[in-house]
């Protein structure tokens, strides 16, 4: 039989965990000093006053290389536990890991062929 009172702890936890961030934002908004001036409106460049416009545009190529790096970095994070327990796991897990490695490699070869990784 479904008893609703068994979930009292869950609802209490949900309400308390929702109220803590709300209270933190409200308290910081009340206690934070409000001071706006030219120092607050200028960008901070390693203690040096910026010359010219502080908003520079980056080439999209930097983001493409960063994205490829993040994909392979995350793949390494997922492959590490598999490598540590390689001797316990069977052949089927090895095939799954091989497929897991081949998918980003195929994607990288495709991006390379399309010219997404070319610098010029």
Curated annotation (Swiss-Prot):
One of its GO terms (cellular component) is NADH dehydrogenase complex. It comes from the Eukaryota. Coiled coil: none annotated. Its main location: plastid. InterPro entries: NAD(P)H_OxRDtase_bac/plastid, NADH_UbQ/plastoQ_OxRdtase_su3, NDAH_ubi_oxred_su3_sf. It is a multi-pass membrane protein. Gene3D superfamilies: NADH:ubiquinone/plastoquinone oxidoreductase, chain 3. It catalyses: a plastoquinone + NADH + (n+1) H(+)(in) = a plastoquinol + NAD(+) + n H(+)(out); a plastoquinone + NADPH + (n+1) H(+)(in) = a plastoquinol + NADP(+) + n H(+)(out). Signal peptide: none annotated. GO terms for molecular function: NADH dehydrogenase (ubiquinone) activity; quinone binding. GO terms for biological process: photosynthesis, light reaction. Its EC number is 7.1.1.-. The chain crosses the membrane at residues 9-29, 64-84, 88-108. It is found in: Plastid, Chloroplast thylakoid membrane. Keywords: Chloroplast, Membrane, NAD, NADP, Plastid, Plastoquinone, Quinone, Thylakoid, Translocase, Transmembrane, Transmembrane helix, Transport. Belongs to the complex I subunit 3 family. NDH is composed of at least 16 different subunits, 5 of which are encoded in the nucleus. PANTHER family: NADH-UBIQUINONE OXIDOREDUCTASE CHAIN 3. NDH shuttles electrons from NAD(P)H:plastoquinone, via FMN and iron-sulfur (Fe-S) centers, to quinones in the photosynthetic chain and possibly in a chloroplast respiratory chain. The immediate electron acceptor for the enzyme in this species is believed to be plastoquinone. Couples the redox reaction to proton translocation, and thus conserves the redox energy in a proton gradient. This is NAD(P)H-quinone oxidoreductase subunit 3, chloroplastic. It comes from Drimys granadensis. The lineage of its organism: Eukaryota, Viridiplantae, Streptophyta, Embryophyta, Tracheophyta.
